[in-house]
Swiss-Prot record:
Localization per record: Secreted
A GO cellular component entry from the record: extracellular region
Family: Belongs to the scoloptoxin-15 family.
Identification of the protein by name: U-scoloptoxin(15)-Sm2a
Task of the protein: Activity unknown, even that a lot of targets (Kv, Nav, Cav) have been tested and activities on insects and mice have been tested.
Main location per the UniProt record: secreted
Record's keyword annotation contains Signal: yes
Gene Ontology terms for molecular function: toxin activity
Disulfide bonds: 39-66, 43-68
Keywords: Disulfide bond, Secreted, Signal, Toxin
């Protein structure tokens, strides 16, 4: 009987752990690229600060740069 109770608790914990893993996955990979509005803001901020390089780093996106030439023109 003890083995059965321990086994059931183990299965319940395993199911809870698997459910917790599934809920965390979409949060980590929520958004990879900024929207057009976020790029427009990044480009406007860059131009306001005197940067005329035609690319701007989008806020909150580590490795993504917006092509300001396409957005502004």
């Amino acid at each position: 009987m003890k083995f059965y109770i321990v086994f059931c608790l183990f299965v319940v914990l395993l199911i809870n752990f698997a459910a917790a893993e599934e809920t965390e996955e979409p949060i980590r990979h929520a958004k990879k690229n900024p929207s057009e509005g976020e790029c427009k803001k990044a480009c406007a901020d860059a131009f306001a600060n005197g940067d005329q390089s035609k690319i701007a780093k989008a806020e909150n996106f580590k490795d993504y740069y917006c092509n300001c030439h396409i957005i502004i023109h």
